[in-house]
Every structure is written in structure tokens, then in C-alpha cells.
UniProtKB/Swiss-Prot annotation:
Oligomeric form and interacting partners: Homotetramer.
Listed cofactors: Mg(2+); K(+)
Keyword Metal-binding: yes
Record keywords: ATP-binding, Glycolysis, Kinase, Magnesium, Metal-binding, Nucleotide-binding, Potassium, Pyruvate, Transferase
SUPFAM superfamilies: Phosphoenolpyruvate/pyruvate domain, PK beta-barrel domain-like, PK C-terminal domain-like
Species per Swiss-Prot/TrEMBL record: Encephalitozoon cuniculi (strain GB-M1)
The protein's name: Pyruvate kinase
Residues noted as binding Mg(2+) in the record, renumbered to the chain: 214, 238
Lineage: Eukaryota, Fungi, Fungi incertae sedis, Microsporidia, Unikaryonidae
Pfam families membership: PK
Coiled-coil features, chain-numbered ranges: none
Length: 428
């Protein structure tokens, strides 16, 4: 029985913040725990970080903690934080000032906003048309009915609202995260190399930076962003709103092609198993979405609301893992049929003891279809390669005898359990 190589990123939220539930997610297949700093207090995030660190100690592998920055996204505040039901044709007012009757949107520059501009709420769930712009706010006509909830995101496609990839709150969040042992940063709304370099100056050289592509500018500067990042996330929610949903398919393919060409890992995110937020099985289209992401070469697939607030978080991870396993099995059979298999066809695992980054990258780029167990005392190695497909980072002191090292760390049966005693390995 082969191990699933594709990594699963889970957003931790109210449904999954306890130590017990995090342990269940890890056992189900979670490789990276994502903390979305657009929601929740730092105190709440600190408790989750502690719970993750306690829960991952018995996993036998490094489960990473990712801090997802707020970025320049606009978050609305409804009066008294209550949900607002809206109908098509209705006119709403948005205010830059806190108000008891208007929807509050702090920190937005309205100079570039004009009449007939489109505005979207909650990844496009609600579409609005600007009908009036004033000094302290603006009015919009609602184009489709729905529910507006407090703290949901707003998008202003094609409009400069004075945003920056890294605001003061983000800097404070990152400093807090570094102090408390986060493993990587997911940087929101990265639009150019300078955005990544600014974050690098904050985190130093030992924390990987994954750039989220979710704007037209990010798409335009994709290659330079990929070159200076440790990985790239296809953040399909905001990106779909920014570029138009009808263009999302080709954008996803282009991001994958450009980023993989530079040898960087890719995370596919947003609504991958969305229906499982409320029910215990995915839609057929979601199965195809996850499976095709694996076939296209994604290193990680990500859950957001499904694992943060969903009714079936653990079941969702298990189902996603099964879909990834099926896609990987199909991919390997296809490659065998085409005669494209290499050394991984004849071994059950590759073991790298105290290897260098270049050694690990070289083996990763050969696209083996078996686990690559990287045993290292370097926290940077463990962090960086935790988002690479097929690489299992394990903390430990390696030795020349890979078999002895695996047995000493209790890993041989756990990661190379293929139903035989004669496990075939290649050690590097």
C-alpha cells in the first residue's frame, strides 16, 4: 500500500482548534496547519500554536505551522456584527467611519473609485455596482440577492484602493508568529518581487515564504515572484474575483506551468471540498478538482472553511487523502504505460540522511513516485521541504546506514509499510 505523496494543508478554526481535533487531523493526513490571521485574536492563535506543537510530537514527521497574513484585503463590518439579507436592486451605503447604520470599511482610499465600478463581497458571492462616491463613503446597487456577513472580504477589481502587501498589522503578526515558533509564512496579495523581499527582511533566512497569487498584478509578475519565493499558492477565491471567474481555469494552468518550471512547489487553494462544510461527502466536481490538481503537479491541496468551521473536518481530510491517492495511482499507471518511470518504479522509498538542499531538490525534480524521507537536524530543511510533494521531513540525526536510522527512529514500518518484509530502499 503506497503512501499518499500530495500534502494536505488544513486551516485551523473554531471546529478544529483543540488538541484532540488537531491530533485527529494529523492522523487523517494533515501535513501543514494554516492559521488565518484575518480571523481571530493573537491570544487565540497562540493557544492553537501550542496545541499543534503538542499534537505533532507523536506524528513521526514534521507537521508545519503556517501563518497566513491579512494582506491588504478589505474586511467589512456590519452594524452590530449582524448578518444583512440583501435583495437585487437595493442600495447600500459603505462608510469609512464607524457607523451604527452603514457598513463600515476601514482604511480604504476612495480616490480611484468611480461610478459603475464593480465591487464584490465574500469571493464574489455578492456583486455590487457603485452608484455614488462621497468623501467618507460610497453607495452601491446590489446586483444579486444574498447574505452579507461581518468580517467578509471585499474586492475592488481594477481599482487602486491604496493597498500594500504588508501592513503594520501584518508586521506585528509575523513578529508574534516568529516569537512563538511558526514554520512558514503564507503571504497574501503578493504583487511583485519587492513584496517578497520585504517579508524576507522580517523573517530572515530560516522561515520559508509562500507567495499567494490573487490579483491581476500578481499574475503579471508571476515569474519574478516565483523566482524569489519558496513556494506559490493559487489563491482562487480573490484571484477569481479579480480576473473574472471565466478566466480562472487558464490562470490556474498558467501558474502551475510557470512556477513548476522554476522548480518551486505549488499549493492549490479555495473551495476544493466546499460542499463538505455542510455534508459528509463531496460533490463529483470537487473530486475531479482535487484529482486534476494532483495530476497537474500540485504539491499541496488546501482546505479552508471545510476544516476551520465545517461540520466534518476530519472526514474531509480523509476523503481528500483518498482522492489524492487515487489520482497518484492513476498517474503512476499512466507513466508506466508510457515507459516514463525511473528508479522509483523499483524501490519503495528514498531515504536522505542529513542531505543538502541541492541533493533533496535534485531528487524531487526527478519526480519519484515513492516517498522521499529526509532525516535532518536542520529546522530550515524540515520547514522548507514540508510543502514539497512526496518529501517526508523527519527530525533526527542521520547515519550512513539508512536502514538502521529508520529503525532507530521508528519510521521503517510507518512510512514504508508496503505489506512486505523486503522493503526496497535507496539511500542518499
Amino acid at each position: 500500500m503506497r503512501m499518499v505523496l500530495t500534502k494536505i494543508v488544513c486551516t485551523i478554526g473554531p471546529r478544529t482548534s483543540s488538541r484532540e481535533k488537531i491530533k485527529e487531523l494529523i492522523d487523517a493526513g494533515m501535513s501543514i496547519a494554516r492559521l488565518n490571521f484575518s480571523h481571530g485574536s493573537r491570544e487565540a492563535h497562540l493557544e492553537v500554536i501550542r496545541n499543534i506543537r503538542d499534537s505533532r510530537s507523536g506524528a513521526g514527521r514534521h507537521v508545519s505551522i503556517a501563518l497566513d497574513t491579512r494582506g491588504p484585503e478589505v474586511r467589512l463590518r456590519t452594524p452590530e456584527m449582524k448578518d444583512i439579507k440583501v435583495e437585487g436592486g437595493e442600495v447600500l451605503r459603505f462608510s469609512l467611519l464607524s457607523s451604527e447604520k452603514d457598513i463600515w470599511i476601514p482604511g480604504v482610499d476612495l480616490k480611484s473609485l468611480g461610478v459603475d465600478n464593480r465591487v464584490f463581497i465574500d469571493d464574489g458571492a455578492i456583486e455590487l455596482r457603485v452608484v455614488n462616491v462621497e468623501e467618507d463613503g460610497f453607495e452601491c446597487e446590489v446586483l444579486n440577492s444574498g447574505m452579507i456577513k461581518s468580517n467578509k472580504s471585499m474586492n475592488f477589481p481594477g481599482t487602486d484602493i491604496g493597498d500594500r502587501a504588508l501592513g503594520d498589522e501584518d508586521k506585528n503578526d509575523i513578529a508574534f508568529g516568529l516569537e512563538n515558533g511558526i514554520d512558514m509564512v503564507f503571504a497574501s496579495f503578493v504583487s511583485c518581487r519587492a513584496d517578497v523581499e520585504e517579508i524576507r527582511r522580517l523573517v530572515g533566512s530560516k522561515v520559508p515564504v509562500v507567495s499567494k497569487i490573487e490579483s491581476c498584478l500578481g499574475m503579471r509578475n508571476l515569474k519574478e515572484i516565483a523566482l524569489c519565493s519558496d513556494g506559490v499558492m493559487i489563491a482562487r477565491g480573490d484571484l477569481g474575483v479579480e480576473i473574472g471567474l471565466e478566466n480562472m481555469f487558464s490562470a490556474q494552468k498558467r501558474i502551475l506551468y510557470e512556477v513548476k518550471r522554476e522548480g518551486r512547489p505549488v499549493i492549490c487553494a479555495t473551495q476544493m471540498m466546499e460542499s463538505m462544510t455542510l455534508k459528509n461527502a463531496p460533490n463529483r466536481s470537487e473530486i475531479s478538482d482535487v484529482g486534476n490538481a494532483v495530476l497537474d503537479g500540485c504539491d499541496c491541496v488546501m482546505l479552508s472553511a471545510e476544516s476551520a468551521v465545517g461540520m466534518f473536518p476530519v472526514e474531509t481530510v480523509k476523503f481528500m487523502r483518498s482522492i489524492c491517492a487515487d489520482a497518484e495511482r492513476y498517474d503512476m499507471e499512466s507513466r508506466k504505460g508510457a515507459g516514463a518511470c525511473g528508479v522509483s518504479s523499483y524501490v519503495d522509498g528514498v531515504v536522505i540522511c542529513s542531505g543538502t538542499e541541492s541533493q533533496i531538490e535534485k531528487i524531487y525534480l526527478s519526480k519519484p513516485e515513492t516517498p522521499i524521507i529526509v532525516i535532518s537536524e536542520s529546522l530550515w530543511i524540515l520547514r522548507r521541504f514540508s510543502i514539497y510533494r512526496g518529501i517526508i521531513p523527519v527530525y533526527g540525526k542521520g547515519s550512513e546506514d539508512a536502514e538502521a536510522t529508520l529503525r532507530r527512529l521508528g519510521l521503517r514500518g510507518r512510512f514504508l509499510a508496503v505489506g512486505r518484509e523486503d522493503v526496497r530502499m535507496v539511500s542518499v
